[in-house]
Regions:
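Conserved catalytic core of nucleotide-sugar-dependent glycosyltransferases
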Residues: 70-167
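A short acidic, amphipathic alpha-helical/loop segment
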Residues: 23-24, 46-47, 73-77
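Short beta-strand-to-loop acidic/aromatic patch adjacent to the donor-nucleotide binding site
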Residues: 57-68
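A short, glycine-/small-residue-rich helix N-cap motif at loop->alpha-helix starts
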Residues: 38-44, 171
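N-proximal low-complexity "stem/linker" segments adjacent to membrane-targeting elements
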Residues: 1-35
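Active-site nucleotide-sugar/metal-binding loop of Leloir-type enzymes
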Residues: 45-59
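Short, high-confidence coil segments that cap the C-terminus of an alpha-helix
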Residues: 56-57, 83-86, 186
Length: 222
């Protein structure tokens, strides 16, 4: 029987209940691992363990439940992931407020340690800057970045084996991942064709269900 050379596992971190996200993810036909209602500092190491014991999968795909994406977005990154150890899409930073003008991409490493920092300590690029870069080089949409906020990030198995998911005071896994990749000499890339919608609202705190609903790990083969 024919088996695809690239076999990603979409790892979904779901601390909320978001119908818009659930509708989007249902349209992507891929094996999924749901990490439901765990705090971040437990969710990521647990997901790493679950992925590593499933040796048939080639890539760990980070997907958070506040990111709206399409099957096209997923397929573009899947088509490129064998060429890069780490490749992601990108999105707006917030959806409302001052930071809605900014992207998830930074051309500098995040503050370290990140736990006591604020968004003002990051150096996120404006969306218009990223759009200009894309339009200036339409034939070269993939760029190297120090940090991109884990926007549907494809990590090769060898990267997941080498790099643990660390946290600082229970948060900031994405920031520390960027530092750990940098320190290990592993480059990460963003495909500018894959722009998604980040549902991060300035005026409303997230309706987290961590501690309110039972946590669970659910494997969902397609």
């Amino acid at each position: 029987m024919y088996q695809e050379r690239t076999r990603p596992l979409l790892v979904i971190f779901q601390p909320r209940y978001n119908e818009r996200f659930l509708d989007a993810v249902s349209k992507v036909k891929v094996d999924k691992l749901w990490i439901n209602y765990y705090p971040q500092h437990i969710a990521y190491p647990l997901a790493r363990i679950e992925f590593l014991k499933r040796e048939e999968y080639t890539h760990f795909v980070i997907m958070t439940d506040d990111l709206i994406f399409t099957n096209r977005d997923y397929q573009i990154l899947k088509g490129e992931c064998e060429k890069y150890d780490v490749i992601s899409g990108w999105a707006n930073n917030w959806i409302t407020g001052y930071w809605a003008e900014y992207s998830s991409i930074s051309f500098k490493l995040p503050p370290n340690p990140p736990g006591q920092s604020t968004i003002y300590d990051y150096d996120f690029a404006k969306i218009i800057t990223i759009q200009v870069m894309k339009e200036a080089n339409p034939d070269k949409p993939i760029i190297e970045v120090p940090h991109q906020g884990t926007m549907m990030t494809f990590l090769s198995r060898k990267v997941v084996e080498k790099i643990p998911f660390r946290h600082d005071c229970g948060c900031c896994v994405d920031a520390l991942l960027s530092h750990d990749l940098h320190n290990a000499g592993i480059k990460q890339y963003v495909d500018l064709r894959v722009r998604m919608l980040h549902l991060k609202y300035a005026e409303l705190p997230p309706d987290l269900l961590v501690g309110k609903k039972p946590s669970s790990v659910v494997f969902e083969p397609q």
